[in-house]
Regions:
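Juxtamembrane/interface motifs at transmembrane-helix termini
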Residues: 38-41, 101-105, 126-128
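Internal alpha-helical scaffold of NAD(P)-dependent oxidoreductase catalytic cores
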Residues: 1-61
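A structural signal for well-ordered alpha-helices, especially hydrophobic packing surfaces
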Residues: 30, 92, 96-99, 117-124
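Interdomain hinge/lid region at the active-site interface
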Residues: 45-113
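Short, amphipathic C-terminal "tail helix"
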Residues: 108-129
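Generic alpha-helical propensity signal that fires on short helical segments
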Residues: 24-29, 37, 69, 77-80, ...
Length: 129
Protein backbone atom coordinates (compact mmCIF):
# COMPACT_ATOMS: atom_id res chain seq x y z
CA UNK A 1 0.00 0.00 0.00
CA UNK A 2 2.81 2.42 0.82
CA UNK A 3 4.33 1.92 -2.65
CA UNK A 4 1.13 3.28 -4.19
CA UNK A 5 1.10 6.34 -1.95
CA UNK A 6 -1.58 5.04 0.42
CA UNK A 7 -1.34 6.08 4.06
CA UNK A 8 -2.41 3.27 6.42
CA UNK A 9 -4.89 4.30 9.10
CA UNK A 10 -5.86 2.33 12.17
CA UNK A 11 -9.51 2.41 13.17
CA UNK A 12 -12.31 0.22 14.39
CA UNK A 13 -13.92 -1.91 11.66
CA UNK A 14 -17.36 -0.35 12.21
CA UNK A 15 -15.95 3.16 11.77
CA UNK A 16 -14.10 2.06 8.64
CA UNK A 17 -17.31 0.63 7.18
CA UNK A 18 -19.26 3.85 7.93
CA UNK A 19 -16.58 6.08 6.41
CA UNK A 20 -15.92 4.07 3.25
CA UNK A 21 -19.66 3.70 2.70
CA UNK A 22 -19.78 7.50 2.45
CA UNK A 23 -16.50 8.14 0.62
CA UNK A 24 -16.24 5.11 -1.68
CA UNK A 25 -19.45 3.12 -2.00
CA UNK A 26 -21.83 6.10 -2.14
CA UNK A 27 -19.90 7.79 -5.00
CA UNK A 28 -20.22 4.55 -6.97
CA UNK A 29 -23.99 4.46 -6.41
CA UNK A 30 -24.33 8.16 -7.23
CA UNK A 31 -22.42 7.66 -10.49
CA UNK A 32 -24.66 4.70 -11.32
CA UNK A 33 -27.81 6.66 -10.52
CA UNK A 34 -26.67 9.57 -12.70
CA UNK A 35 -26.06 7.26 -15.67
CA UNK A 36 -29.43 5.59 -15.03
CA UNK A 37 -31.22 8.96 -14.92
CA UNK A 38 -29.70 10.06 -18.23
CA UNK A 39 -30.43 6.65 -19.76
CA UNK A 40 -34.05 6.98 -18.66
CA UNK A 41 -34.26 10.41 -20.31
CA UNK A 42 -32.47 8.93 -23.33
CA UNK A 43 -35.30 6.45 -23.79
CA UNK A 44 -37.53 9.44 -24.65
CA UNK A 45 -34.86 11.67 -26.19
CA UNK A 46 -31.64 9.94 -27.30
CA UNK A 47 -30.16 13.37 -28.02
CA UNK A 48 -29.37 13.67 -24.33
CA UNK A 49 -26.24 11.58 -24.95
CA UNK A 50 -25.05 14.15 -27.50
CA UNK A 51 -24.95 16.75 -24.73
CA UNK A 52 -22.96 14.90 -22.09
CA UNK A 53 -19.70 16.63 -21.28
CA UNK A 54 -16.34 15.68 -19.89
CA UNK A 55 -17.75 16.60 -16.47
CA UNK A 56 -20.43 13.94 -16.87
CA UNK A 57 -17.84 11.42 -18.04
CA UNK A 58 -15.54 12.26 -15.11
CA UNK A 59 -18.37 12.22 -12.58
CA UNK A 60 -19.63 8.83 -13.77
CA UNK A 61 -16.25 7.14 -14.32
CA UNK A 62 -16.69 4.81 -11.36
CA UNK A 63 -20.00 3.53 -12.77
CA UNK A 64 -17.82 1.49 -15.15
CA UNK A 65 -16.23 -0.38 -12.22
CA UNK A 66 -16.47 -4.13 -11.81
CA UNK A 67 -20.12 -4.84 -11.00
CA UNK A 68 -19.54 -8.19 -9.31
CA UNK A 69 -16.93 -6.75 -6.95
CA UNK A 70 -18.98 -3.65 -6.12
CA UNK A 71 -22.16 -5.65 -5.65
CA UNK A 72 -20.34 -7.86 -3.15
CA UNK A 73 -18.96 -4.80 -1.31
CA UNK A 74 -22.39 -3.16 -1.21
CA UNK A 75 -24.07 -6.33 0.06
CA UNK A 76 -21.39 -6.84 2.70
CA UNK A 77 -21.74 -3.25 3.95
CA UNK A 78 -25.48 -2.91 3.38
CA UNK A 79 -26.36 -0.99 6.56
CA UNK A 80 -23.55 1.59 6.40
CA UNK A 81 -24.34 2.09 2.70
CA UNK A 82 -28.02 2.61 3.48
CA UNK A 83 -27.05 5.19 6.11
CA UNK A 84 -24.83 6.96 3.57
CA UNK A 85 -27.69 6.98 1.06
CA UNK A 86 -29.92 8.59 3.70
CA UNK A 87 -27.30 11.22 4.42
CA UNK A 88 -26.97 11.94 0.69
CA UNK A 89 -30.74 12.15 0.32
CA UNK A 90 -30.81 14.82 3.03
CA UNK A 91 -27.98 16.73 1.31
CA UNK A 92 -29.91 16.65 -1.98
CA UNK A 93 -33.06 17.83 -0.21
CA UNK A 94 -31.10 20.75 1.26
CA UNK A 95 -29.85 21.67 -2.22
CA UNK A 96 -33.38 21.38 -3.58
CA UNK A 97 -34.62 23.72 -0.84
CA UNK A 98 -31.82 26.17 -1.69
CA UNK A 99 -32.83 25.97 -5.35
CA UNK A 100 -36.42 26.75 -4.37
CA UNK A 101 -35.21 29.79 -2.41
CA UNK A 102 -33.70 32.96 -3.74
CA UNK A 103 -30.52 33.19 -5.80
CA UNK A 104 -28.49 34.37 -2.80
CA UNK A 105 -29.46 31.31 -0.74
CA UNK A 106 -28.51 28.96 -3.54
CA UNK A 107 -25.22 30.73 -4.14
CA UNK A 108 -24.41 30.65 -0.41
CA UNK A 109 -25.10 26.91 -0.21
CA UNK A 110 -23.01 26.16 -3.29
CA UNK A 111 -20.20 28.45 -2.13
CA UNK A 112 -20.02 26.68 1.23
CA UNK A 113 -19.80 23.31 -0.52
CA UNK A 114 -17.13 24.61 -2.89
CA UNK A 115 -15.10 25.97 0.04
CA UNK A 116 -15.26 22.60 1.80
CA UNK A 117 -14.05 20.80 -1.32
CA UNK A 118 -11.23 23.28 -1.85
CA UNK A 119 -10.17 22.99 1.78
CA UNK A 120 -9.71 19.24 1.38
CA UNK A 121 -8.51 19.31 -2.25
CA UNK A 122 -6.76 22.63 -2.90
CA UNK A 123 -7.27 23.63 -6.50
CA UNK A 124 -4.49 23.76 -9.04
CA UNK A 125 -3.88 27.32 -10.27
CA UNK A 126 -5.91 26.74 -13.46
CA UNK A 127 -8.90 25.42 -11.44
CA UNK A 128 -9.07 28.60 -9.37
CA UNK A 129 -10.29 30.69 -12.30
Amino acid sequence: ALATGAQPLQMQPERHDRLVALTSHLPYLLACSLVAAVEQRGNDDPGVWDLVSTGFRDTTRVAASDVRMLSDILQTNREPVRAALGQQRRALEALEAALDGDADSLQAALSAIRATRQRHFPPAPAENE
